[in-house]
Swiss-Prot record:
Name this protein carries in UniProt: Elongation factor P-like protein
MF-aspect GO terms: translation elongation factor activity
Domain of life: Bacteria
Transmembrane portions of the chain: none
One biological process term in Gene Ontology: peptide biosynthetic process
SUPFAM superfamilies: Nucleic acid-binding proteins, Translation proteins SH3-like domain
InterPro entries assigned to the protein according to its UniProt record, in alphabetical order: Elong-fact-P_C, NA-bd_OB-fold, Rib_uL2_dom2, Transl_elong_fac_P/YeiP, Transl_elong_KOW-like, Transl_elong_p-like_YeiP, Transl_elong_P/YeiP_cen, Transl_elong_P/YeiP_CS
Native organism taxonomy: Bacteria, Pseudomonadati, Pseudomonadota, Gammaproteobacteria, Vibrionales
SMART domains: EFP, Elong-fact-P_C
Family statement drawn from the similarity comment of this UniProt entry: Belongs to the elongation factor P family.
Signal peptide (from-to): none
GO CC terms, sorted: cytoplasm
Length: 189
């Protein structure tokens, strides 16, 4: 079993008999000599959807739970449920909107490279690709000749996500966004 320092986002861990899917990890180092790093795992209980937070010292053993990854593509929305289809056998996986609210900011009909994370055959969450292409819906007018400056402006993308983009980017442009950092990477070709 891995130590707390080896746990990554997307791992499923056992917390008091409950399966918790790790969505975010925060590492803190207490002051003073000999202070061990403390890992704070944030996620949600797979069975109930309740948000959970747990802390472990770096060298503590954490019980992980096996997960399965299946390549999926977005299919359609039904109320507050988002339906994704397996790329191989066309099995449908249904996700509640609250469980994948952060991931929805990066998903449109064209998003490729997504994976459904399954725990005991049940869809728990989505794993996004490292970057996605999205269209800018609204931003300030572009400034010609601004490619040399490093100044940025806010831009609202087609999914509702707002990122900082260079001044030369205009409404309607397609841009590449890093899903982990939620940052503009470059203009899509």
């Amino acid at each position: 079993m891995p130590r707390a320092s080896e746990i990554k986002k997307g791992f499923a861990i056992n917390v008091d008999g409950k399966t918790v899917l790790v969505k975010d990890i925060e590492v803190t180092t207490p002051g003073g000599r000999g202070g061990q790093k403390i890992y704070r795992f944030r996620g949600h209980d797979v069975a109930t959807g309740v948000k959970t937070e747990v802390r472990h010292k770096a060298d503590e053993i954490v019980e992980t739970i096996d997960v399965t990854k299946r390549a999926v593509m977005f299919s359609y929305v039904d109320g507050n449920e988002y339906i994704f289809m397996d790329n191989e056998d066309y099995t449908q996986f249904i996700f509640n909107g609250e469980m994948i609210e952060d991931e929805l900011l990066f998903i449109n009909e064209d998003t490729q490279g997504m994976y459904a994370i399954l725990i005991d055959g049940t869809a728990a969450t989505l794993e996004l690709p490292t970057s996605v292409e999205l269209v800018i819906e609204e931003t300030d007018p572009s400034i010609k000749g601004a490619s040399a400056s490093a100044r940025t402006k806010p831009a609202r993308l087609s999914t509702g996500l707002t990122v900082q983009v260079p001044e030369y980017i205009a409404t309607g442009d397609k841009v590449v966004v890093n899903t982990a950092e939620r940052k503009y990477m470059n203009r899509a070709s």
